[in-house]
Regions:
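Bacterial N-terminal signal peptides that target proteins for export
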Residues: 1-8
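Glycine-centered tight beta-turn/hairpin loop motif at sheet-sheet or coil-to-beta transitions
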Residues: 44-46, 85
Length: 238
């Protein structure tokens, strides 16, 4: 491995280590109903994250959202941007983190799949998982639950979305920034939030895991396509 590649890996991992966990999309708009149908809130005693619907009883999220011993549940807001406490739709009865995930290794795949006790209502539909790798310059729609302004101390539960652009794509990771003059992006509740393709059908391409200096960092899902599909199939059969 040459020095250029080693230097790139070092810089990327250093950026991930220094980043904060993603908590909210700052400067974003209320998500439209199409995005709402794919996206779910994940609650715990310590806070909340965002998840993506893979099946009516299967949800994909960030592994760091799962704390051993915590009772997790999924829910959503009342719709139309209403800043209300979410309805609890189901408890989480099983969690499977990526086998290479480690809290001590910031470069490990920050992914987990949840099995729900009760299937989600029909207003939710499974997302289409893309096997295409991300590339620099790709525009993606990011979605997540959390505060919509940096000065908010308590964030109402509203699903928001924003257009972000991939500025770097490297070995299963992507770094994204706002498009144009907008200062929008991930900030401290969006962990596990989806990144959808911008053109055509909203296929799932990435998952938000952290933010730093107005940049959003995400796991590029094409590298983990096989694990996601295999784990989903195993959990769906239980």
């Amino acid at each position: 491995m040459n020095r250029t590649i080693l230097a790139a890996i070092t810089l990327l991992l250093a950026a991930i280590v220094c980043a904060e966990r993603a908590d909210a999309l700052v400067g974003a708009d209320v998500a439209d109903r199409t995005i709402q149908r794919y996206t779910i809130a994940i609650g715990s005693p310590k806070g909340r994250c965002t998840g993506v619907v893979l099946a009516q009883n299967i949800v994909l999220t960030a592994a760091h959202c799962i704390v051993p011993g915590d009772k997790l549940w999924v829910g959503d807001h009342a719709g139309g941007g209403s800043p209300t406490i979410p309805s609890r739709l189901s408890a989480v009865v099983e969690t499977v983190s990526h086998p290479l995930w480690s809290r001590k290794d910031a470069g490990s795949p920050d992914l987990a799949i949840l099995r729900l006790a009760t299937p989600l209502p029909d207003r939710f539909i499974p997302v289409t998982l893309s096997s295409r790798h991300l590339a620099e310059g790709d525009n993606l729609i990011a979605a997540g639950y959390g505060k919509g302004a940096a000065e908010e101390t308590r964030s109402p539960l509203v699903l928001r979305m924003v257009l972000l652009r991939v500025t770097r794509a490297f070995r299963g990771w992507a770094i994204l920034a706002s498009v144009g003059e907008d200062r929008a992006g991930g900030a401290p509740g969006d962990s596990g939030g989806p990144l959808f393709s911008y053109r055509g059908m909203h296929s799932l391409m990435g998952l938000i895991v952290s933010i730093s200096d107005r940049q959003t960092r995400a796991v590029a899902l094409a590298a983990h396509y096989g694990w996601i599909k295999e784990t989903q199939a195993k959990l769906s059969g239980r």
